[in-house]
């Protein structure tokens, strides 16, 4: 479907992409990984035609459509939530409008009119095209996707300008999913999702008809979704089979092999340089010295990938507490008529490790503040 061929991109002295070559198939599920600043977003922008490489090519089949979700910065305004989501089907809705207008015109013409059969044929063409879009199911699809991403039925008529930045990104995700491009480019799509919406998105993308290329720091999400992993490191694009866990294992094997090859090459270079230095001025060895110099110049030197800097820290030990740290019994909390917490009972003991989950607005932060 899409071929990346020898992509090169350089910012100043730094290579972002160096001879990057890969392919993306019709149904591929690919995780794009690499350290911050490695070039992941840049590669997505190149695929979305928002940035040009210095050289190389992105070959796409004629039928390919691409949808790109940036990390942030998308603001929708001027429509209700439902209308904004519906705009993903703009071409389909335009066809419906054209058919209605043409049908009205057709009724005003005589059957012997010169334009009658031309318009009739055009309506037939448009109707056949609409059949592929299953227009009757559009309202169901729109509401299904919006509900999956955490919107309530009461949100449908709200103006998009009423939603915060995180919910704006959910609207953008919904529109992309509804538009159903051949390739989805998703840059950190789970950043603004609660765990329930994240699981819904994960399952939706598994069933998605097209290909998906996703950037995420959520290893479990990548493992669950992806069957292939692209890694960008020091400008190189490495391709691995499997999700993130498989990538980690294969990457370690590749790097260990690279280090061994590097050490072996360095020893050979050192031996050659010693020979050259030792016999450089000896006439009987002149031809051998020149031969070694040429061989040294032709060596394609192996480069070792530098390890990412990591930060190590630890919390100072807390004063020893009693066995029961916190105990809540029949705790209630309301904001006006809205009951956020009702009859919550919980005991937290020394050494417990707890996760608090729930939909956005369910009351997680409120409970944490009450406990604090």
What is each of the regions a protein language model found here?
Residues 250-306:
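Intracellular alpha-helical coupling/juxtamembrane segments of multi-pass membrane proteins
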Residues 1-262, 309, 316-372:
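ABC ATP-binding cassette signature C-motif
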